[in-house]
Amino acid sequence: MQQTTKSLCENIQGCKIGYVESDEISLLLTDYDTLQTDAWFDYSVQKICSVSASMAALFFNKHWQKNVAELGDVYKSKSELGAYFDARAFNIPKEEITNYFIWRQNDATRNSIQGLAQANFSQKQIHSLNNSQLQDKLHEEKGINWNDCKTVEKRGSCVVHVFDKSINRSKWVIDEEIPIFTQNRDYIENILKKLEG
């Protein structure tokens, strides 16, 4: 999914950041780099959704096949049907962009804890437990400390545009060590400041 997100960022006009967690990708697209900057597909929501979903499927299946070639039978049976994606597009004010990514990251954290609990307990054992209770149950009964999971497993990852001095140009990179956005809003805010120039 990270490679799919990176490919989308590299190929979608006006993309400024990608955020990925589990099977969900969020992209920030803008059209205000200059007065002459055009919006991707002139704001046609149907076109944006259909093309971005198609691109995600294309890139994901391409990257998945590469994994199948490298890892063999582990992935082979899962690759026969291929993956497909849906997409949504909506406008939000600049002032709400950071809050949007906070919301997505909070969802990632909740899903991470619940997914780890579901992998270790039956639905009956975890029914009606909140995330704090799930973490306690994992630690007390299985010796698993969710806080010891990798950052990318707990919070997701971002694909960001950085300047690479060695090639003297910008490139998209995957950041697997993103901060907790509620504790470090500057991570997103600094990307937005770069947009404002």
What residue spans do the PLM features occupy?
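Regulatory and interdomain segments flanking nucleotide-handling catalytic cores
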Residues: 1-197
